Amino acid sequence: MLTGYGQVSDTLGLVDFGGVSFGNIGTGYPYPFPTSQVTYRSPVMSGLRVAVGIMDPVDTTNDASSALDEAYQDSPRFETEITYQFEVGGAQIYSWVNGMQQTSKNTDSTVDEVDSQGIGYGVQAKMAGFSVTASGFQAEGINPFYTNNAGEAQLRDVDSDGYLLQGSYTFGKNRIALSSGKTKDDGNGLGTAADYETRGIAYFRT
């Protein structure tokens, strides 16, 4: 749901550093910033589709306190996604599961390397004018708010997780939507533990 004020922080203002305040940025999922990549997507086979990608990795091991500080990666970030769509009882179902992995090091050998890995999953169901979507993620060593680790926080192998629930009903030219998202983090994104939640309701007329 792209309306609403979005998630805010007492110290940072908007979690995305003062950018747009779309409804659930910062809660429920790491915002997927564009990145250089080579991705293969298979044809849809009986509703099943597989994607595999090699991505430009991001710095996660910056340590400004070290004179030798320089984050680097030996290999790209790997991502994959499996989607499956089908119909049952008159409802259209779209489901997905995805994952990522990357490792970041530092030229200062005293700075621990970070092995980042995560998994995401979700399902969407549509029937008549109703639409319901539920998704979530669990990860270790990632920035739980934005995939490019904006601000280059020094990350650690600590956990984060979140979920996003959205539902809507369309009748005529009208649509009513509800949304609720939550992200919990042990301290990677902001340096201290975070527990953010956003709820929203919207009315659209086209």
Predicted regions and their residues:
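Detector for outer-membrane/organellar transmembrane beta-barrel domains
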Residues: 75, 80-201
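Outer membrane beta-barrel
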Residues: 1-60, 74-76, 83-89, 125, ...
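Glycine- and other small-residue-rich loops at beta-strand/loop junctions that grip anionic moieties
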Residues: 29, 71, 156
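A short secondary-structure junction signal
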Residues: 51-53, 61-65, 108-109, 146
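Solvent-exposed, low-complexity segments and loops of surface/extracellular structural proteins
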Residues: 65-69, 192
